[in-house]
Amino acid sequence: PQITASIGPSAGGAVYSPAMTDFVVMVDKIGTMFVTGPDVVKTVLGEEVSFDELGGAMTHGTKSGVAHFVVKNEYECMDRIKTLLSYIPQNNTEETSIVLNDDDPNRLDHNIINILPEDSIKPYDMKEIIYSIIDNHNFFEIHELFAQNIIVGFARMHGRTIGIVANQPLFLAGALDIDSSNKAARFIRFCDCYNIPIVTLVDTPGYMPGTNQEHNGIIRHGSKLLYAYSEATIPKITIVIGKAYGGAYIAMGSKN
């Protein structure tokens, strides 16, 4: 696995290398990445923009998706990388480490029934369900601020690392769009490369409609999610929590 820590300015050709690594951690107000700087943007387009607005940590963490993690300082950056390394193997030929804990794998969470609303139209927080089914309620989320209508991240079950992909009804009702399709597809392909099983929790009304999505290539980007699931040879377990309609049902790790 390759991990980038962005703790300073990076511009031009130097920004392509971080984008090709598996995970990018950016320090807020310090790390910046852009192909062309604010001066060039002003000269060519007449657009006034600051370093942070153009390529700061929050920009890449919430809009472009280049940053998988946005942290406050360098210490938090190193801690986040250490935690990430605890979930993944050293290379694609190894298995992930087993971390023993006192959480009974046969534990039943009777409160889970209270998380789901009786009215299927009402939103709920899918993360509450995730916390209830994993070891010690510890979930290491990836791309937390980007494409929040889908959740991806690492957790453990009975001490073994798993990847979790889940629709988030709190955002866009859990519908799939361009960004969420790319986010989930990339995560699935990483898990497939490094022998990490995937558990998928589904509650989605479909793909996001509209001219904006169609014109920007929802067909092309949406198909990446189907391809990632189809290509993956790791164990895949899918649980339909709520809605699963249309093409989004097929895309979210369905038996089809």
Which residue ranges define each predicted feature?
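Ligand-binding clefts of soluble mixed alpha/beta catalytic domains
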Residues: 1-256
